């Protein structure tokens, strides 16, 4: 929660208010679909820290599970993680889930603007090492606020969405 999912969607789509942004963790409580050209960006509730009841958290878990288990083609999932912190047990559990269900995914490390230059390389390497065993295709260092890494992520997503020749 509160890693900047909605902010990154807005930045990727070049739209300021496409996804609702809040400073309070846990505000995304439903699955939100955003159609951009021929693709859908899907903003899911976060699975980490949020001041919500256990009942709400269980409902979010069911919602997310039902979304992933539905019979639909997912080109790629972008797991957003806060670049300032090491991957949590919840982060790794999500990677295990994605790997087990053969859902192709990449990791976008958010809030890179909050890191010192010297920390960026170290964090990127730590996350690459952590994510690799779970089939993570790539790790991107991003900042929705400054635009860092957004174009690289956008190009990767465009390539994933391109029709196969």
What spans do the regions from the language model cover?
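Flexible beta-alpha connector loops of hexameric P-loop NTPases
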Residues: 47-57, 84, 113-116
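Inter-motif core of Ras-like GTPase G domains
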Residues: 56-84, 96-108
